[in-house]
Every structure is written in C-alpha cells, then in structure tokens.
C-alpha cells in the first residue's frame, strides 16, 4: 500500500471591498481576502496539500497568479481541477484535515457548510473531511486582524502497483 501525506498552507490579507470566501462559503464580514482569484485561503491550502502529496508541485505551478485566466477564479473550481489531476496521477484521496486561523469573524457557524462544500469538491463523504476554526489569541498579523490563514493535510493512496 503506497500512502502519501501532503501539507498545504496559505494566507491572504484582509481588505475592504471584497467578499470573504472560505471553503466556498461566503461569510458576512466587512472585509474580504485579497488575491488574484477569490482568495479562498482554505481551498488554496487544501489544493496545495493535494498537489504536494502527489508530488505535483504547488498551486502556483498549476494556477499561476500571473495568468489572467485565473483572475477572479472560483477556488472551488481550482480545487476540483486539482482533484482531477491528482486522480489522473493515480491517487485516491483518503481524507483531508484543515484549520482556518482568523481572529475575526467567528467562523464556527460556517464550518459545517465549508465541510460540506469541500467534501463535494473532493468527491469524499463528509466524514473524511474536517475543518477547524481557530484564533491566534490576538498574536501577530492574524491576531491583529490583518489577514486569515489556513493549514491543511491530506492522505492519498496510490492505485498504481509499485
């Protein structure tokens, strides 16, 4: 049995005039994440974890922020494409665990919706996808409310014989 672990991380600055999207869920807040795409840090971290576990590079290699094709892109679409590429490389996704770090807004009311969206995008049952919401206890740039970060790990299993 060939198992692979991948780890992903992303952070984006909070700015006025943009919607806040995490895990494909639009969250009511006076600021949103700044980025080339919709800046969904949670989807980006999971996408990076998948690519890393499959040794396929990272999100920037596949969806560069210098490419206008991805300007304003829905990160769930990018995640689904990452899933397709990982499966094409011969891997099945076993599970995903993730953490969003944000001082504000309070994310707990949205975690189950995020989990549901992500499970659908990953082609997994929700019991194989976990989303946790944490604060940084008012420490650093995240604690000052300057941005939001996300971490993710995934486990892949190869369908190929070694």
Swiss-Prot record:
It comes from the Bacteria. GO terms for molecular function: 2-C-methyl-D-erythritol 2,4-cyclodiphosphate synthase activity; metal ion binding. A divalent metal cation binds at residues 10, 12, 44. Pathway: Isoprenoid biosynthesis; isopentenyl diphosphate biosynthesis via DXP pathway; isopentenyl diphosphate from 1-deoxy-D-xylulose 5-phosphate: step 4/6. Gene3D superfamilies: 2-C-methyl-D-erythritol 2,4-cyclodiphosphate synthase. The record marks 36, 135 as: Transition state stabilizer. Its cofactor is a divalent metal cation. 4-CDP-2-C-methyl-D-erythritol 2-phosphate binds at residues 10-12, 36-37, 58-60, 63-67, 144. It catalyses: 4-CDP-2-C-methyl-D-erythritol 2-phosphate = 2-C-methyl-D-erythritol 2,4-cyclic diphosphate + CMP. GO terms for biological process: isopentenyl diphosphate biosynthetic process, methylerythritol 4-phosphate pathway; terpenoid biosynthetic process. InterPro entries: MECDP_synthase, MECDP_synthase_CS, MECDP_synthase_sf. Keywords: Isoprene biosynthesis, Lyase, Metal-binding. Binds 1 divalent metal cation per subunit. Its EC number is 4.6.1.12. HAMAP family: IspF. NCBIfam families: ispF. Belongs to the IspF family. Involved in the biosynthesis of isopentenyl diphosphate (IPP) and dimethylallyl diphosphate (DMAPP), two major building blocks of isoprenoid compounds. Catalyzes the conversion of 4-diphosphocytidyl-2-C-methyl-D-erythritol 2-phosphate (CDP-ME2P) to 2-C-methyl-D-erythritol 2,4-cyclodiphosphate (ME-CPP) with a corresponding release of cytidine 5-monophosphate (CMP). PANTHER family: 2-C-METHYL-D-ERYTHRITOL 2,4-CYCLODIPHOSPHATE SYNTHASE, CHLOROPLASTIC. Homotrimer. This is 2-C-methyl-D-erythritol 2,4-cyclodiphosphate synthase. It comes from Laribacter hongkongensis (strain HLHK9). The gene is ispF.
